Amino acid sequence: MKSLKHIVNEQGFSGKTIINVDIQPEYAGGMFFKPYEWCEWLNEVDGESSRIVFLYNGADTLGMISEDDYKNWLIENALDESVLDTAIFYDKGYAFFRYCIDNYIDDDAVANFVRFMYENDIRDSRDMDREAWAKYLRQYRRTDKKEVYTLLQASGDCVHIPDLMDFLKRYNNIVLTGGGVNECLKEVEIALKALKKPYSTFSKFTY
């Protein structure tokens, strides 16, 4: 069995931004790995001069875990305090693009729509007027099949642009961990695609 240090060296995490999505106690029952193994890996990665970011569903957005309690949970799972001291924490919330995801709209089509909204400073798809929709449909007529337009026009639900987009925009050389792969992790992936930020996913620590 390969050691964590060997995995870190083999995968080449040096200088990467490791963005961990919703690896927190509320979701531990659905994970396919042990939180302490993930924390031990982060300790090794941090030693390779990587930046560590924790995106989580917390007290400010969803009334869930506080940042202090989250940090204590990480320490209980063997995360080094030196890693904690330099890590970045962001209470992100969720369900920005879930209506499209849950209705099986193509990820690239959702990302294109999110990019259009972001670049045109439209935070809520319900604020899209006829002119904005026409502009979007023209811009992506060769790639999208009006899936987003058809879905949102027929429902009262929406896509909204979270502050998370501005946060993610700062980072490069991104490696993702966490989950859920068809839920919050996918929302982060779509946000990165919309921002045209290349990323990879480390499947050993996804759920």
For the regions a language model picked out, list residue spans one by one:
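A short, acidic, amphipathic alpha-helical segment used as a generic capping/interface helix at domain edges
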Residues: G156-R170
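Catalytic cores of soluble, metal-dependent hydrolases
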Residues: M165-D166, V181-E187, A194, Y207
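A short glycine-rich beta-strand->turn/loop micro-motif centered on a GG-aromatic cluster
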Residues: V175-N182, K197-Y207
